A protein has these predicted regions:
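Alpha-helical transmembrane segments and their immediate juxtamembrane cytosolic regions
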Residues: 1-326
Length: 326
């Protein structure tokens, strides 16, 4: 099995951004500071959409490699168990939502896509366009109703549709330009620049955040170089481990976060944690194929103990399709 390294790097970028935003959400927000405004305007609600998009993409990859929807059901049910366990110490976890929406939305959508492909072999109908259109419609509906977790199923479907369509790389630059401009204009409108009617409007903010997520996604793919990929890939390959341990760090640091009026503790906790995770993930993956929680998840998915240790830094294990969290 060959991993798509760009997706690992993009996943790692999202993990780092989520750590920053989650840390900030557990800080006191009065009095407001420049750090609060910067995070809210540039980062808040921009990274979970990337995570959700990647989840839909990885769903297609896993299904194509296994040809087994039962394996996907097991994968999602075990993810639900991880989420319920995490919920005992971190109520804002997203794993339960991902598992439930995956079961309710992605599995039926995969049947729809396969059915259309069987009816019209070689047609665009079987290439993901109906799923993509359905995802866009669901995202528009969710945005009009307050966004939040309601965005997840639509973004899942968009990721699934894009993976089936495989749009050409030459579209990255124009997509980045359009989404970055849209995000900047909408964020300025939401912030009240120029005194427009959209100041403080949550729908305007939600659309700005989605455009920002698209800009970050396409921007990272455009600027990705070997040195940057080497930093982000390990973080992304161990996304489940890093996400869960990151939330544990936030819980442990709740008191200093809530008592710091300057908000510098937010940056200190988030940056220190992400740097530590980058270093640990890189070290771990020179010795093992999968991160600690990724390995447990894999063993549970396949009902067997999967070999994990590398020999002399090389992988001699027989690979199984990767149920890794995007």
């Amino acid at each position: 099995m060959t991993r798509i390294r760009e997706l690992d790097a993009l996943r790692g970028f999202a993990v780092g951004g989520i750590m920053l935003v989650n840390t900030w959400q557990h800080a006191a927000h009065e009095p407001r500071t420049g750090i609060d405004w910067t995070i809210e305007a540039l980062f808040q609600s921009r990274f979970y959409p990337i995570f959700s998009l990647l989840f839909g993409i990885s769903f297609v990859l896993f299904l194509d490699r296994t040809r087994s929807r039962w394996a996907l059901v097991r994968r999602l049910l075990w993810l639900l168990c991880f989420g319920l366990a995490q919920h005992t110490f971190y109520e804002g976890e997203v794993l339960t939502d991902y598992a439930l929406y995956g079961l309710a939305v992605l599995l039926p959508a995969s049947l729809l896509s396969s059915g259309l492909a069987a009816l019209r072999p070689g047609s665009f109908l079987g290439g993901g366009l109906p799923v993509l259109v359905l995802g866009v419609a669901a995202t528009v509906w969710a945005t009009a109703r307050g966004a939040g977790p309601l965005l997840i199923p639509g973004l899942f479907l968009i990721g699934m549709g894009l993976m089936r369509l495989r749009p050409p790389r030459r579209l990255l630059a124009p997509a980045f330009a359009v989404s970055a401009l849209a995000s900047a204009l909408l964020t300025a409108t939401w912030a009240g620049v120029g005194g427009g009617p959209g100041a403080g409007d949550w729908t305007v903010y939600s659309v700005a955040a989605l455009a920002g997520a698209a800009a970050y996604t396409t921007g990272v793919l455009l600027v990705l170089r070997p040195w940057l990929s080497a930093l982000l890939e390990p973080l992304g390959r161990m996304a489940l481990t890093n996400y869960v341990t990151g939330t544990a760090v936030i819980v442990l640091c709740t008191t200093p976060l809530k008592t710091d009026p300057t908000r510098w503790s937010v940056l200190a906790v988030a940056l220190t944690t992400v740097v530590a995770q980058v270093l640990f993930s890189g070290w771990w993956l020179t010795r093992y194929r999968y991160g600690p929680l990724e390995w447990i998840w894999r063993c549970l998915t396949w009902f067997r103990r999967v070999p994990n240790r590398l020999e002399s830094g090389r992988d001699h294990n027989r690979p199984l399709p990767d149920p890794g969290l995007p």
